[in-house]
């Protein structure tokens, strides 16, 4: 009876013990270099020859194989004991020979590569064994472990078959040396870290190829970034162009609307002038039943006749107001210390034909009505009558054609007839100067008192009317004509100024917006103070940002007229303050 030194089991014969030990070896054998287990003896031999050929010299390997496989049958106990010792020696070699630091010194990917390599070797060994088993005519001895181990080896990498193990070893070392690098104890092989990702390479050339891949990828990414950046810039440029186009289109639209609004406001929208507006209003009155058709035709005929001869028909005129004011201040006004009145002047109010834009023309009619009643201006205004509005427009165009105020003419397109264009202080000055009437423009361009008031304006008008008066009578009828007063959007005519007993000043103003029925209330004999409310304007009533006045001061000589025409090429006004 034979007893197994490994597990204690007893067997009857040496072949049974040998088979029993082989079972132990197949189940328990472990690679002494890398601790690979779970494979049979033939597989572990093939594994050691191919993977650990540098650590396992041929002669040592032969001794191990002989110790395990070539024991004599006569030395039963000794062989079994030796076999057990070899087996335990193999186990101890696996524990002592495998470097403890190897797993730590190698990167994880190197370990993965070796495991894959071991699995491949084992697979190849098993394939070789199966092919041997399938060949017919082989005896049991020929299929033994010796023949499997020393049969013509095949390269596990490229499949080449060599005549012996030494030739295969040389082949693997020379052809597949880079694949057989394994961790060795106390091995100081230089390693190369990738500067871009930290990968450890065992060969400088491999590192160079690896870094080149990084650079190619970076270059490709940069190229893609440049393409993307270029595409983004192009898209941004297109969006900016579209935004600029829309903004310019919107600005152009707003500019056109504002320009058209200004054209309508100043009567330059080609919608007709005085004549067309008068006819439209009269037709509207007929349609509403406020005017009989016969009256429409009668008034139309009168209007056409007035335009044809160039003289105002007088239907909007109110005369005698200055005389009525003189009577009032003489008999009734007890709160007034002194009053200065201009020369006689007629009031003209707007009609259907010039409503909304004709205040400047109506104020010129008032001023001219005063000048025509003065002998001082008889020479320069000889044979004139108060003109109608279309005639005044024609007279201003004639003054422009003479060379007066070219800048103002260009702003109005050198045309007033047939339009509803407003006129202001510059046009009044131009027209009077062309008629040889001496006048001046004074610009009160900013307020000179609290709350936006203009006390300097009142002081200037007081000095204008009181300059030729000695003493302080209550009522002073001066020889000074009325003053044209302009502010933004409207104009009026100053016909006098009164000083209260408390020394406050109040202007007396004719407004072309006031209808004749209101002005005629001033002609009553028993006129009340409340009737003057529409004429009186205190300092607190004039709070526009800017005021301009045109004051008449006499007659120009022909030479002075030429000089003033030359000066009007660059029009300037006197500024106060």
Swiss-Prot record:
The modification N6-acetyllysine is found at residue 261. It is found in: Cytoplasm; Nucleus. Residues 124-137 have a biased composition (Basic and acidic residues). InterPro entries: UfSP1/2_DUB_cat, Zinc_finger/UBP_domain, Znf_C2H2_type. Residues 248-273 are annotated as: zUBD/ZHA. The keyword Repeat applies. The active site is at residues 359, 490, 511. PROSITE patterns: ZINC_FINGER_C2H2_1, ZINC_FINGER_C2H2_2. Residues 225-247 are annotated as: MIU. Interacts with RPA1 and RPA2. PANTHER family: ZINC FINGER PROTEIN, ZINC FINGER-CONTAINING UBIQUITIN PEPTIDASE 1. Belongs to the peptidase C78 family. ZUFSP subfamily. This is Zinc finger-containing ubiquitin peptidase 1. It comes from Mus musculus. The gene is Zup1.
